[in-house]
């Protein structure tokens, strides 16, 4: 049976982005995201879909929105997280994909925390808000409770990876206890 997992990148303060985009450019992490999610269903909220500007290639894109007349070309549109997970699991089982990925945004990540079995989190050695001199709205990653989650030492970086674009980075894979 496929695994349901979330994947995100966050800065030192847990910032994911602005709600409509990211505050950094780390090409090596983008490549990591592509490798992890390629061939798998990806679930995202409408704002994340719109920030992307279109479907992620080589993936089944599933968009959650409460707008019943919403059209997302190249994606399946559903109206609830539960419906998106059901569809993602069916697609993964039919295609042999090992994982159904939650890919954002902040509300979808938060709502999915009780459902997912894994979290793949890229930690960026960067304070994105300070680096960009930006004020205004930012969104944060969900809190990871160590009583619920443990790092998988086999899938977790012991050290920082080299700087790519704006920051050095490392990945921690969290497994539900």
Sequence positions of predicted segments:
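Enzymes that bind and transform nitrogen-containing heteroaromatic metabolites
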Residues: 1-177
């Amino acid at each position: 049976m496929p695994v349901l997992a979330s994947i995100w990148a966050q800065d030192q303060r847990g910032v994911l982005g602005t709600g409509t985009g990211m505050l950094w450019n780390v090409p090596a992490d983008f490549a990591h995201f592509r490798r992890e999610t390629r061939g798998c269903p990806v679930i995202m909220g409408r704002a994340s879909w719109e920030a992307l500007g279109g479907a992620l290639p080589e993936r089944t894109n599933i968009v959650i929105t409460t707008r019943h007349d919403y059209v997302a070309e190249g994606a399946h549109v559903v109206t609830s997280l539960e419906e998106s997970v059901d569809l993602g699991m069916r697609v993964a089982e039919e295609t042999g994909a090992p994982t159904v990925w939650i890919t954002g945004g902040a509300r979808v990540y938060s709502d999915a925390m009780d459902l997912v079995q894994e979290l793949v989190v890229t930690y960026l050695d960067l304070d994105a808000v300070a680096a960009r001199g930006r004020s205004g709205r930012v969104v944060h990653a969900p809190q990871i409770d160590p009583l619920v989650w443990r790092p998988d030492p086999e899938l977790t970086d012991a050290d920082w990876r080299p700087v790519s674009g704006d920051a050095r980075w490392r990945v921690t894979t969290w497994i539900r206890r």
